[in-house]
Curated annotation (Swiss-Prot):
Key words of the record: Calcium, Cell membrane, Endoplasmic reticulum, Lipid transport, Lipid-binding, Membrane, Metal-binding, Repeat, Transmembrane, Transmembrane helix, Transport
Protein name in the entry: Extended synaptotagmin-3
Subunit structure of this chain's protein: Interacts with ESYT1 and ESYT2.
Gene it is expressed from: ESYT3
GO biological process: endoplasmic reticulum-plasma membrane tethering; lipid transport
Length: 886
């Protein structure tokens, strides 16, 4: 064989020239597909322009189409971006939580210590997910697909072309078990469900393809195991439902991409959420029996545990949302009040930042704890309503306290408070508690368990009373009535109407649904029932049941088969009627008050007991005595609006400091408020008993007011303090400086002189999950000028000392006895609050560049030593460094 001659270093071989195409050929092969793609895009973009010109349409239609396309593309990109972000969170959960620890969008087990993380359950689900996917795929093809084809003749070609449930499995972000309920025969567990799936489901119907590529579902799923048994299988049934409507977002493909179009995407998602809510959101539930032969009626359709009556009274200091040319205007506020699937909307108060509604809404509550009261405030506009703040209240504490009358601070807004009165109404069977309707409020509820009907007439035009006999039927109607009716039921009590589901083509329909009504007058109101045919749009039977007919039956329950009027001779409907009366029950005596108004259950009855047994000492009084100081009318009016009717008995003992000196009587308007006793008269040490009355005590509850004591003006010598503070003291932002003003002190050491006192009421509100600090007022403050001082109070929850975490009261001008009555809330978990301290400083407001003294004193309170659930209200002595005097 002849050896091949070696080629020159720069020359290509003949074999390489045959196998490797030249650069011109490669360039042409790449440009050809790109050129074709470019031409197709140009034709696609210019096609609508040519079509508009051919049809003689104006350019407005082109702009409108371009706008709709851009909007659709924006929605599409946003949905894909949210899905990608959710996938990233699932893949890097630990890093995301570490980076966003201070954020609000975190799993429930981080925010709430009673929610446990169950990572072991997620590992089990992840391991078994491929097998579960195979099971679901077979169920879809073998059972779901034939059922869909049987629904209509137009769905006979319906086929699942692709079923892939992806690698992303559902997760349980947190589990909370409720063990403090009274029912010992049930286990209640709340699961924080999160499914961010990469599933791909495609369907085909008459060569039209559609499908889903990605689903997000988040919500709280409650699982109830009830009743617990002593033998196998130890559980009678499993009940599953969502406490609130879950959040659902679907990424559509194929023809269903049109559902992402502007104006349609929100409607499509809401329709799917409503479809889930009709089956799985309270009061709807799914009950799966575990033990055979068990009656599941009470489990599938339980009675409400109570009724909450919401008095939407007023709001104040709402944010200004109506702006015109940069000028701040007012708002047109209205409120949306909801519990689960029950929603109400108040009327709109136009151009008012302090609206008054005085409206009442009533809700049925099925699960406590679990369901929350949500209030959202909006500013009504012609284009889009602006958000003014929201509020979420746990109904468990309202059920415990029976009545809560409180001003609530709105969340997610700059300013605003909402005044609500919440009443928990118990369901009773005692007819003695039945009262007449007062002001349109409900006195009872009616629960209707609609079971089934039998022997409904096929021909709705052949009633015995001859109502439809005279009508002439067309040939189409005669042929149609030979089929069984598709019946549904309309039930109404008063102005409220409910409609059942439709049972297609069945003369013995089974509905198995429950409906609830509020009753205003049991003696006069009736239940109106009408069975209708969905195909013929006519009545198949009617029934009227007076509600007073239920009163003679045991447990106010009537269960029987009722004969339908205007129907066949043997047409019956089976249902159960349950009547319950509504009443606000009194709280048990001696039980601790845990509601939000507990912060303001201060001294209502004040008793003064002299401890000096001198000749001028007065004996202990049996009844309450009022202070000689005249109250402020405006503040009293405000306190009455915050009052509530239920309190607990408690007694607080405080020692009133003695006045060292008495000065000349001040002149001016504030002199009457500053002095409680005649000038020049010596005061003896006295013990102040602050008594909070029990639930049967009359009169409104007022906020704690500081005790008015005579001012003791004295001069301070020139002095500068810079005390060394350790531990938490070094974190306080108050730097005490007394060298800015020359005053005189008789007697020496500044540390031994009193700087005044401040009254605080501190308590952890479980209802709001926050620490509430009520600044009541101050007394005996140090004067900064000849006219007194302009004090205000600054509060920090150490160790947080950022400007955003700073709380500040309003400034009270020219007074040494300021009354604030301002509440601040710190949204911190209970376990975290125990590790914190309060830094409360009283300061003097001074103009910019002024040399007046700013610091008047401060107080440091270690919260780990206090009972925050019970709360405390007392006077604290102001010191330069916040520590109590030794």
């Amino acid at each position: 064989m002849r050896a091949e001659e070696p080629c020159a270093p720069g020359a290509p071989s003949a074999l390489g020239a045959q196998r490797t195409p030249g650069p011109e050929l490669r360039l042409s092969s790449q440009l050809l597909p790109e050129l074709c793609t470019f031409v197709v895009r140009v034709l696609f973009y210019l096609g609508p322009v040519y079509l508009a010109g051919y049809l003689g349409l104006s350019i407005t239609w082109l702009l409108l189409g371009a706008l709709l396309w851009m909007w659709w593309r924006r929605n599409r990109r946003g949905k894909l971006g949210r899905l990608a972000a959710a996938f990233e969170f699932l893949d890097n959960e630990r890093e995301f939580i570490s980076r966003e620890l201070r954020g609000q969008h975190l799993p429930a087990w981080i925010h709430f210590p009673d929610v446990e993380r169950v990572e072991w359950a997620n590992k089990i689900i992840s391991q078994t997910w491929p097998y579960l996917s195979m099971i679901m795929e077979s169920k879809f093809r073998e059972k779901l697909e034939p059922k869909i084809r049987e629904k209509s003749i137009h769905l006979r070609t319906f086929t699942f072309t692709k079923l892939y449930f992806g690698q992303k499995c559902p997760r349980v972000n947190g589990v909370k078990a409720h063990t403090n309920t009274c029912n010992r025969r049930r286990v209640t567990v709340d699961l924080q469900i999160c499914y961010i799936g990469d599933c791909e489901i495609s369907v085909e119907l008459q060569k039209i393809q559609a499908g889903v590529n990605g689903i997000q579902l988040q919500g709280t799923l409650r699982v109830i195991l009830e009743p617990l048994l002593v033998d196998k299988p130890f559980v009678g049934a499993v009940t599953v439902f969502f406490l609130q409507k879950p959040h659902l977002q679907i990424n559509w493909t194929g023809l269903t991409n049109l559902l992402d179009a502007p104006g349609i995407n929100d409607v499509s998602d809401s329709l799917l959420e409503d479809l889930i809510a009709t089956h799985l959101v309270l009061p709807n539930r799914v009950t799966v029996p575990v033990k055979k032969g068990l009656d599941l009626t009470n489990l599938r359709f339980p009675l409400p545990c109570g009724v909450i009556r919401v008095h939407l009274l007023e709001a104040e200091q709402l944010a200004q949302k109506d702006n015109f040319l940069g000028l701040r205007g007012k708002s047109d506020p209205y409120a949306k009040v909801s519990i689960g699937l029950q929603h109400f909307r108040s009327r709109t108060i136009y151009r008012n930042l302090n609206p008054t509604w005085n409206e009442v809404f009533e809700f049925m509550v099925y699960e406590v704890p679990g369901q929350d009261l949500e209030v959202d405030l909006y500013d009504e506009d012609t284009d889009r309503d602006d958000f003014l703040g929201s509020l979420q209240i746990c109904l468990g504490d309202v059920m415990t306290n029976r009545v809560v009358d409180e001003w609530f601070v709105l969340n997610d807004t700059t300013s605003g408070r909402l005044h609500l009165r919440l009443e928990w109404l118990s369901l009773l069977t005692d007819q003695e508690v039945l009262t007449e309707d007062h002001g349109g409020l409900s006195t009872a509820i009616l629960v209707v368990f609609l079971e089934s009907a039998c022997n409904l007439p096929r021909n709705p035009f052949d009633y015995l009373n001859g109502e439809y006999r005279a009508k002439k039927l067309s040939r189409f109607a005669r042929n149609k009535v030979s089929k069984d009716p598709s019946s549904y039921v309309k039930l109404s009590v008063g102005k409220k109407t409910h409609t059942s589901k439709t049972c297609p083509h069945n003369k013995d329909p089974v509905w198995s649904q429950v409906f609830s009504f509020f009753v205003h007058n049991v003696a006069t109101e009736r239940l109106h029932l009408k069975v209708l045919d969905d195909d013929q749009e006519c009545a198949l039977g009617m029934l009227e049941v007076p509600l007073c007919q239920i009163l003679p039956y045991a447990d106010l329950t009537l269960e029987q088969r009722f004969q339908l009027d205007h129907s066949g001779l043997d047409s019956l409907i089976s249902m159960r009627l349950v009547l319950r009366f509504l009443q606000v029950e009194e709280r048990e005596l001696g039980s601790p008050y845990t509601g939000p108004e507990a912060l303001k259950k201060g001294p209502l009855l004040i008793k003064k007991v002299a401890t000096n047994q001198g000749p001028k000492a007065q004996p202990q009084e049996e009844g309450p005595t009022d202070l000689p100081c005249p109250p402020d009318p405006a503040s009293d009016t405000k306190d009455v609006s915050r009052s509530t009717t239920t309190t607990t008995s408690a007694t607080t003992v405080a020692t009133e400091p003695t006045s060292q000196e008495t000065g000349p009587e001040p002149k001016g308007k504030d002199s009457a408020k500053r002095f409680c006793e005649p000038i020049g008269e010596k005061k003896s040490p006295a013990t102040i008993f602050l008594t909070v009355p029990g639930p049967h005590s009359p009169g409104p509850i007022k906020s704690p007011r500081p005790m008015k004591c005579p001012a003791s003006p004295f001069a301070w010598p020139p002095k500068r303090l810079a005390p060394s503070m350790s531990s938490l003291n070094s974190l306080a932002s108050s730097c005490f400086d007394l060298a800015d003003i020359s005053l005189n002190i008789e007697g020496g050491d500044l540390r031994r002189r009193q700087l005044g006192e401040i009254q605080l009421t501190v308590r952890y509100v479980c209802l709001r999950r926050c620490l509430s600090v009520l600044i009541n007022g101050c007394r005996n403050l140090t004067p900064c000028t000849s006219s007194g001082a302009d004090p205000y109070v600054r509060v920090y929850l150490l160790p947080e000392r950022k400007w955003a975490c700073r709380k500040k009261t309003s400034v009270k001008r020219k007074t040494l006895e300021p009354l604030f009555d301002e509440t601040f809330e710190f949204f911190v978990p209970m376990e975290e609050v125990k590790k914190r301290s309060l830094d409360v400083a009283v300061k003097n407001s001074r103009p910019l560049g002024s040399h007046r003294r700013k610091e008047l004193g401060k107080v440091l309170i270690d919260l780990s030593k206090e009972d925050l659930i019970k709360g405390f209200s007392q006077w604290y002595e102001l010191t330069p460094n916040g520590q109590p005097r030794s």
